[in-house]
Structure formats: C-alpha cells, structure tokens
Amino acid sequence: MTQIELSCSAVHIIGAGLAGSEAAWQVANHGVRVVLHEMRPHRMTAAHQTGGLAELVCSNSFRSDDAANNAVGLLHAEMRRLGSLIMRCADANQVPAGGALAVDRDGFSSAVTKALDDHPLIEINRTEVDGLPPADWRNVIVATGPLTSAPLAAAIRALTDESALAFFDAIAPIVHRDSIDMSKAWFQSRYDKVGPGGTGADYINCPMTEAQYHAFVDALIEGEKVDFKDWEIDTPYFDGCLPIEIMAERGRETLRHGPMKPVGLTNPHDPTVKPYAIVQLRQDNRLGTLYNIVGFQTKLKHGAQTRVFRTIPGLETAEFARLGGLHRNTFLNSPKLLDTQLRLRAEPRLRFAGQMTGCEGYVESAAIGLIAGLYAASDARARSLAAPPPTTALGALLGHITGGHIESIDAGPRSFQPMNINFGLFPPLANPPAKKPDGTRLRGNEKTIAKKQAISARALADLDRWIADALRVAAAA
C-alpha cells in the first residue's frame, strides 16, 4: 500500500463482479480514489439473484487450490501474494470440497461487499452506465462480464466494429500437444496450403476408418448433453457455431462433409489408404503447446467429451487443457482490440478486465481484474509498471489475452476464444526435470508431475522478483 494521493483523478470501474471488485481493491490499496459503478439491484441481469458484489451466479468452486501441481492453484497463490481481496474472502468463506477451494457463495459476496463498502477510497455508485463513459472519465476499467447490458455492449461495439463482440461463443476442446500420439496423427495443411504465418503443415490430422467414423457419430448423438440455462434458451446459433452433435443429428455424412472432411490430406503412416474422415487440430497458442479440435464446439457434458473424443485415433491418451462448450457470452477479440496493458487501442482511457477480455472462470476473471487495477493505479499516479513475467500464471494469462493467441492460419472467422489458465500457456522450461533425486530416469506420470512442479516453482520465484523489482518500485516512485 502506498501513501494516499487524493490529488489523483478517480478511477471509474464499471461492473462489480469478481474482476471489477478485485480491480477496485487494488486501485484503492495503492492510494487512488475509486468510483465503482454497479447497476444491480436497480437493474438486474438474467442470471444474478442479488445486489451483492462479486455474486457467484454458477458454481461456488474456485477449482483446485494445489499451487504445486495445478495451474489454477498456482494462480490462487500468486493472487494471495498480491493481496487479492477475492482470494482473502474466498479463504475466509471456504466450505469443504476436497482439494478444491469452494466457498459459501452468500458469505463470500457479503464479505467482498463489506470490504469495498468500508474502504475510505471507494465509492459504490448503484446506477447503470448505459453508454460510453463521459469524456472526463480519463481512467476507466470496464468489467461488466459475460452478461453486459445491451446499451453498453452496443456502445462498445460501435466504438470497435460489428464483429468485436460475440454474443454466443463457440468453444472447441483444446488438447496438450505432447499428449497426442503422432505415430497415428501427422502434420499437414489441407492441400499443403501455406497461409499467412503458416508452413503448409500447420494442422495435426487424425484419420478415421468408415467403421470408426460411424461409431464416433453414434457416440456423439447418444452422449449426455448439458441443458441451456434459462437466459440462453432464446439466443440463436451464429454461423459456424453449431454444436458438433447437432450437425451429426442432421445426417450421418454431415460431419465428413464439414469439419471432418478427408479431402486434400494424405496419411504418411499409410499413404495408399484414404481415410474415411479426418479430425483436424489447429495450433492454439504461439508456444505450440496447445491445439484445438477444429469445429468441435459442443454441449456434451465433460465426462462424455473425454470419453467420446478419446476414441479418435491419436487422441486415445489426450490431455485436455479445456473442454468444449457453447453458451451465451460477451467477450472482446482482445488480441486485436487491446494493448498489452488491457487498454482499448481505439480509446486508451478505457481498460477492460474480467471475462470480457477472453479469460474463462471466476479466478481468471478476478486475476485480470487485479492486473487491470494495478495498471490503472499506476496510470493515475503517472507511474510505469512492467507486465508480470510470462513465466508466472498472471503473466501467462495476460499474455494469452493480449497477444499470445494465433488469430488464424487460414481464411475464416477469428479463432480467439475464452480460456482457463493451464500449463500450456506457460513458456517451456529451459531444462525440464529428467531424473529423480536418486538419479533414475523420470517416466510417465512422474515426469508430468515433476514438470508441473518445476513450472510452478519458477512462476512463484519470478513473481516474487517482479513484486520486488517492478511493483514496489512503481508504488514507491
């Protein structure tokens, strides 16, 4: 915390969900006044039930709290080191949930609301911001979440372009590259086409025989589906967003004439046999550690997804960084629209945070709110703040949102989609662990665990250095 600087202009934060609440806390704790705008309870969304700040509208779980072996647990640890209000209130309202951090949702929201309401530098304004903020608001964080009100969403869309906001996002599963069996799969672009930034071998291809294809179609149709939430039912599908199981229901050959078409590709493992269908995976991050399954947006339940998708040749032992989904959402094409400090390129006084930026999950939304708050506080005090290292969970998530994602290899709609934190977003280790303390070689699951633990240890060490070298220097300047 720094000396209070009442001469600073207030930071206006629109939306008091997890991201907005965390951002407000960070800004105020760095000595800068905050006006936190929240339209509830005077204007409710289709999902919220109360006027409480940081209301959890779906699950009450913050997922794994294991900082050594799980990426979201590591993110928990990093946020705690930075004095996160969301993590403090989650810890104080924890309920039993095994290795996960789950909370009493009402107690959690009440604790966040009280902390912000009691802070001398935070003013909570219970009115709707129904358009672009006034021009004299020079330092603004927009953290209105996936259910942004229509007037504000329209204003943001007009400021950017019609395609900048998606209101029904299609999420395809993402697989860790090193879990794909390349003795069955191969790299090749359709017709060996070299697109922008491509090489002609930009996709991983998984072949299917006729029998495998028909068994796969049956499994898709029979798989257990997630029901739409009440506020999603009337939302139409957009072009290119049909769930794969809906396509399968329209005809047994639909998929092999759509995302699974086998044309323009030759299997080098068996070049004389033409596959009946082919599943393609496309690189999903610049590091090349994550690949998404092209066209596989789905409403299958997660258990059904892992069971069905692991029947694909080459994906029998696939590890998923994210499973698929299709739900109503509002998010920006952040790599195109935001700079590295989450500011809108078209109007830099506006900074975005939370799920609107393309992160997925409670913890990730709060984490981006935390970073946005630190940046806004630095701007208000005319200070410069370096980004957290990309080797940290915070830096890896920020890097993915603002530029770590590949927009597109070939022609077609943008591919940026919401993402949970996962180890695939981190830069590879320079010297990954290969041996146990006794000198024997690490293999299988032991090797995977050792790698995750090394990434986590590196992250916390680098975060501590960043706090000492960048954050404290910026705060004290």
UniProtKB/Swiss-Prot annotation:
SUPFAM superfamilies on file: FAD/NAD(P)-binding domain
Top-tier EC class: transferase
Highest rank taxon of the organism: Bacteria
InterPro entries linked: FAD/NAD-bd_sf (IPR036188), MnmG-rel (IPR002218), MnmG-rel_CS (IPR020595), MnmG_N (IPR040131), TrmFO (IPR004417)
Reactions performed catalytically: uridine(54) in tRNA + (6R)-5,10-methylene-5,6,7,8-tetrahydrofolate + NADH + H(+) = 5-methyluridine(54) in tRNA + (6S)-5,6,7,8-tetrahydrofolate + NAD(+); uridine(54) in tRNA + (6R)-5,10-methylene-5,6,7,8-tetrahydrofolate + NADPH + H(+) = 5-methyluridine(54) in tRNA + (6S)-5,6,7,8-tetrahydrofolate + NADP(+)
Molecular function via GO: flavin adenine dinucleotide binding; tRNA (uracil(54)-C5)-methyltransferase activity, 5,10-methylenetetrahydrofolate-dependent
Keyword tRNA processing: yes
CC terms in the record's Gene Ontology section: cytosol
Keyword set, alphabetical order: Cytoplasm, FAD, Flavoprotein, Methyltransferase, NAD, NADP, Transferase, tRNA processing
Amino acids binding FAD: 15-20
Subcellular location: Cytoplasm
Family matches, as Pfam families: GIDA (PF01134)
Cofactor: FAD
A biological process from GO: tRNA methylation
EC number: 2.1.1.74
Similarity comment: family membership: Belongs to the MnmG family. TrmFO subfamily.
HAMAP family according to UniProt: TrmFO (MF_01037)
Function recorded in the entry: Catalyzes the folate-dependent formation of 5-methyl-uridine at position 54 (M-5-U54) in all tRNAs.
UniProt xrefs under NCBIfam families: gid_trmFO, PRK05335.1
Name of the protein in question: Methylenetetrahydrofolate--tRNA-(uracil-5-)-methyltransferase TrmFO
Organism name: Nitrobacter hamburgensis (strain DSM 10229 / NCIMB 13809 / X14)
Lineage, top ranks: Bacteria, Pseudomonadati, Pseudomonadota, Alphaproteobacteria, Hyphomicrobiales
